[in-house]
């Protein structure tokens, strides 16, 4: 069993940001959905981001989204990780996720701005029951 300290961030959905030495060192453990304690800290669940510092202003990230599991990317998760990495710094932060690369711009007393590509990854059909 592994334990990590996390930083709680609201963007405004809840995130627990965990920095690790290497995302590659413990691939199997990081692929499993983490258990967050105390559960009362996040009664509606939480997205958990594992992040690795690559260089100043550059991080790699994996994310477990609440109710879904590991996903290839998470915009609010990238913002949460960049905000924690930034500390009191401003500027553009590169966040590499399994689905590609995004950038988070952080300005003093301003909003976080997420930039990056948007790609269609699936197409489907939804049937809605009559009378609903």
Residue ranges and their predicted role:
Residues 79:
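Catalytic, metal-anchored helix/loop core of enzyme active sites in primary metabolism
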Residues 1-73, 82-132:
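Active-site proximal loop and beta-alpha junction motif in alpha/beta enzyme cores
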């Amino acid at each position: 069993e592994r334990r990590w300290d996390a930083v709680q961030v609201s963007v405004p959905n809840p995130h627990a940001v965990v920095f690790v030495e290497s995302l590659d060192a413990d691939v199997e453990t990081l692929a499993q959905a983490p258990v967050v304690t105390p559960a009362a800290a996040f009664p509606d669940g939480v997205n958990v981001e594992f992040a690795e510092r690559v260089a100043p202003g550059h991080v790699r990230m994996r994310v477990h989204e609440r109710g879904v599991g590991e996903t290839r990317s998470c915009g609010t998760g990238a913002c949460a990780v960049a905000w924690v990495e930034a500390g009191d710094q401003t500027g553009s932060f590169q966040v590499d996720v399994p689905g590609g690369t995004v950038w988070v711009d952080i300005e003093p007393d301003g909003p976080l701005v997420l930039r990056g590509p948007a790609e269609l990854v699936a197409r489907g059909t939804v049937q809605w029951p009559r009378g609903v």
